[in-house]
Amino acid sequence: MAITSVIEQMRQLIQLIAKHNHAYYVMDQPTISDSEYDHLFHQLKALEEQYPEFVQADSPTTKVGGQALSKFESVTHVVPMLSLGNVFNQEDLFAFARRVEERLPNQKVQYEVELKLDGLAISLWYENGVLVRGVTRGDGETGEDITQNVKTIRNLPKVLHSEKYEIPRLLEVRGEVLMPKSGFEKLNADQEAKGEKTFANPRNAAAGSLRQLDPNIAAARPLAFYAYGIAQCEPNHGLTTMHDSLQWLTELGFQIAERQYLCNSIQEVQQRYEQIQQERPNLQVEIDGMVVKVDDLKQQQQLGFLSREPRWATAYKFPAQAALTTVEQIDWQVGRTGTLTPVARLNPVFVGGVTVSNVTLHNIGEIHRLDVRIGDTVSVYRTGDVIPKVEKVWPEFRPAEAEVVHLPESCPVCASPVVMPEGEALARCSGGLYCAAQRIEAIRHFVSRKAMDIEGLGDRWVESLLRLDLLKDVADIYHLHEHRETLLGIEKMGEKSVQNLIDAIEASKKTTLARFIYALGIRGVGETTARMLANTFQTLEALKAANVEALKKTPDVGDITAEWIADFFLAPHNIEVLDRLIAAGIHWDAPTAPTRQPLNGESWVLTGTLEQMTRDQATQMLQALGARVSGSVSSKTKCVVAGEKAGSKLEKAAKLGIPVMNETDFLSLMAGYGQTLS
């Protein structure tokens, strides 16, 4: 066969298959049978196998992506991929509409309603109609380049075609990759038949497929892409509404979710929500709600964005999903400060998109409140990413042999006595750092980012070092360099890893008194309290010598916390560890003359979504002026700073007559004290 004839035949088959793909996936109107489609596909594949040098870049057979990658490259999003706010009931939905319509006075607002697909959000870049890059959402600012994997998705166009519209020079399309229910069921059946691990839900299957370094694995999975929006288009597409944008995307070859509704009122949106909820079991894909968007693109621009989400859209989530299961056992876990937490081991149950087999019961008081026993039938609830919880016990199903749960008398890890001071809800192991569970959690806390910030000393290192008996307490961290040969013998720990760890430990020796106090893991002492203690006592020696009465005078330190701090510094073992840490070279700058702190001791509350700054920035400015930032409003609150969507805290402030300040006024006040956004 002549070369030109081969290439021409390949081109004809590619165009024909693309046309039928569009009819099947996008228009949902198949024009040929599956067997006819397979015949065309295999005809093209046979030609390509015979003449591999003439395989075309946009061939559907090349969607099996090539060589496996060693890692995914990071990519910064030109337009951030923001998340959506959530509403969970009609009242919240109507409040969202009020906020929208108050910002668009005297304008008619229409809402575009779409299915909220339960998949993995990605961004696709096309240059002159050719797919050049696919990137995961990541943290919204930076994602991972998964181009090879997205090219394997069968319904995703690699080259854009349209008889109606001109193909833009640059186009960035956002959408969701997911696995339809039928494909998910078949995949799990195949996995089970091969004796391999099955997937908990379609979303996990889709996400796991896209994160395979070998694109051939992704190609074998039944993935689908559904477009939901346009991030960039050059030249501008000239479209004026969200609804038209979605239709335009279908003309270019993209598939969109199987239902969209244009609603003239928020009441109509609520009706569609109820309709979709009824139809949910019959849909081809998993959804966890619907997305409500202001339809007019100019109105979207007018509304703008909050710091992390658009004002013109929200996700209307479905109610919690529940399932019945039985409690097989209740175990007790020991935390960093010795707290004993009961954990119910359940007969595994699929609820809210995941298989749940463990649920925390928080404390013995919660066990008594629920009257939950080993062997009981319970209702487990879960919504979205919320941690599953036991909502109800069904005593009518209780077996005769059901066991009442008692607080253990001794620690399940070290056998030290369990204590529960009068008036407290939490029981604790009295073993301190003698208890292995407390020791490992204490070390994890000590090295964490907000404490000593020892980069690279993660859980795998800590567990290995504990097994080798190189870490008996946190002070041993600063002697690890003496065991270099032992460290090199740890699996997957090469010369570079060991040196990086030693360097990070050395770098952590220069810190601040506040960080050091926080790192000690004293019960009741968080970041804010540690900062207050450092400001008040100025030196470690003064803090160690302080009695309960002196400690109680520190802002943010109550009677009980003062006793916990005093007890910590009275324990001989703790003093020994402190002395070894200081001897190892941990140090901080000597205290300077106190700076002006006009808000010293005042309690401030931040509520709502802040637009002009982050909560961390606002907190840092307040703390620099001596104030403490509280999570709740009380009669002692000096002022409340309210952003968007401020709720119950704002109402409580009004009832108590607490002053309320908006962001602009707050920033002006801070500027007057010399505090500005950095």
UniProtKB/Swiss-Prot annotation:
GO CC field: cytosol
GO biological process: DNA repair; DNA replication
Pfam families (alphabetical): BRCT (PF00533), DNA_ligase_aden (PF01653), DNA_ligase_OB (PF03120), DNA_ligase_ZBD (PF03119), HHH_2 (PF12826), Nlig-Ia (PF22745)
Cofactor(s) the record lists: Mg(2+); Mn(2+)
EC number(s) on file: 6.5.1.2
InterPro entries reported in the protein's UniProt record: BRCT_dom, BRCT_dom_sf, DisA/LigA_HHH, DNA_ligase, DNA_ligase_AS, DNA_ligase_CS, DNAligase_adenylation, DNAligase_N
Residues that bind NAD(+): 34-38, 83-84, 114, 137, 176, 293, 317
Residue ranges of every copy of the BRCT domain listed in the record: 594-678
GO terms, molecular function: DNA binding; DNA ligase (NAD+) activity; metal ion binding
Binding positions (Zn(2+)): 411, 414, 429, 435
Active site: 116
Catalytic activity of the protein: NAD(+) + (deoxyribonucleotide)n-3'-hydroxyl + 5'-phospho-(deoxyribonucleotide)m = (deoxyribonucleotide)n+m + AMP + beta-nicotinamide D-nucleotide
DNA repair among keywords: yes
Family: Belongs to the NAD-dependent DNA ligase family. LigA subfamily.
Protein's recorded name: DNA ligase
Organism: Acinetobacter baumannii (strain SDF)
Gene of this entry: ligA
